[in-house]
Amino acid sequence: MLIYDLTYEELEEFIVENGYKKFRADQIWNWLYKQKIEAFSEMNNIPEDIIKLLNDNYTFAGLETVIKNTSADGTIKFLFDLKDANLIETVLMSHNYGMSACVTTQVGCNIGCSFCASGVLKKKRDLTAGEIVAQIIRAEKESGVRVSSIVIMGIGEPFDNYKNFVKFISIVNHPKGLAIGARHITVSTSGLVPKIKEFAHLGIQVNLAVSLHAPNNEIRSKLMKINDRFKVEEVVDAIKYYIHVTNRRVTIEYIMIQDLNDSVETAVELAKLLKGMNVYVNLIPYNTVKEADYQRSSLENRLAFHKTLKEHKITAILRKEQGHDINAACGQLRSQNL
């Protein structure tokens, strides 16, 4: 078992159950998340018997960096090799408010979005909470920067690995560790309706983003197989439920694809669908991938779409393009190396 799989409370319980004082857990946690050690033997204020105990029961993630690409805009994309030889991706993105990490939750993905490179390689397994945590640790060490926010938007559907990604949040959010505030963490889902409703009752102030990408079932079904299970209307109802329970705004993710979902008429339809909801729309320039025969929406169309939403009183932003020159779209780097 990975040491990063333990919450602070679980580590404390383990230490106490083995006859040691609670403060030792505090020391170990500090070594893990402040000093970012990669071997228990590096903890020079921990007795040797505790180090032996840890070595006998836990391991480090052992992520090996296969590829590290840096974009002209400062985006850094990592391809990591797990201990079982599976490959995952992590991306660091530079913003004016700090460095954001986009983490992966699964090896492969079963959602099967037609525009995405991740779905070409089907899901092999879920990542543990510790394997998700390890991406942050490794990315920080490799880049020399501190991650101040997290987006759970890498390879995989987080709500299909619900228990582990929720545990991951509790670990990185702990004030004595990485201390990344809940409001600086965003989880993105393709629209697993039951899990959206369950997440509403979790009681943490993590941001929710929903990949909608279309205002109707005809277009969305072309883009996302998940729409065969959960129609647009069901997803929107789940979003309304989440907003009602949490009183929190939801981000609507909308990848703009030329001549498919980027017309002014489609923008009007989207505005009507979202009317009166506490949401904002994130308009995303499509990162072309060789696995899909789609093209990025023209700047003219993106601007017109954005203008139309604003005219209909829908808050929307045109997301800045990042990492296009290093294949930073989800799943691209992994698919090229398998």
Curated annotation (Swiss-Prot):
S-adenosyl-L-methionine binds at G156, E157, S188, S211, L212, H213, N287. Its cofactor is [4Fe-4S] cluster. It catalyses: adenosine(2503) in 23S rRNA + 2 reduced [2Fe-2S]-[ferredoxin] + 2 S-adenosyl-L-methionine = 2-methyladenosine(2503) in 23S rRNA + 5'-deoxyadenosine + L-methionine + 2 oxidized [2Fe-2S]-[ferredoxin] + S-adenosyl-L-homocysteine; adenosine(37) in tRNA + 2 reduced [2Fe-2S]-[ferredoxin] + 2 S-adenosyl-L-methionine = 2-methyladenosine(37) in tRNA + 5'-deoxyadenosine + L-methionine + 2 oxidized [2Fe-2S]-[ferredoxin] + S-adenosyl-L-homocysteine. Disulfide bonds join C102-C330. One of its GO terms (biological process) is tRNA methylation. PROSITE patterns: RADICAL_SAM. Binds 1 [4Fe-4S] cluster. The cluster is coordinated with 3 cysteines and an exchangeable S-adenosyl-L-methionine. InterPro entries: Aldolase_TIM, Elp3/MiaA/NifB-like_rSAM, Methyltransferase_A, RlmN_N, RNA_MTrfase_RlmN, rRNA_lsu_MTrfase_RlmN/Cfr, rSAM. It is an enzyme of class 2 (transferase). Residues 95-325 form the Radical SAM core domain. Its EC number is 2.1.1.192. The active site is at E89, C330. Keywords: 4Fe-4S, Cytoplasm, Disulfide bond, Iron, Iron-sulfur, Metal-binding, Methyltransferase, rRNA processing, S-adenosyl-L-methionine, Transferase, tRNA processing. GO terms for cellular component: cytoplasm. Pfam families: Radical_SAM, RlmN_N. [4Fe-4S] cluster binds at C109, C113, C116. GO terms for molecular function: 4 iron, 4 sulfur cluster binding; metal ion binding; rRNA (adenine(2503)-C2-)-methyltransferase activity; rRNA binding; tRNA (adenine(37)-C2)-methyltransferase activity; tRNA binding. It is found in: Cytoplasm. CDD domains: Radical_SAM. Reaction proceeds by a ping-pong mechanism involving intermediate methylation of a conserved cysteine residue. Belongs to the radical SAM superfamily. RlmN family. HAMAP family: RNA_methyltr_RlmN. Specifically methylates position 2 of adenine 2503 in 23S rRNA and position 2 of adenine 37 in tRNAs. This is Probable dual-specificity RNA methyltransferase RlmN. The lineage of its organism: Bacteria, Bacillati, Mycoplasmatota, Mollicutes, Acholeplasmatales.
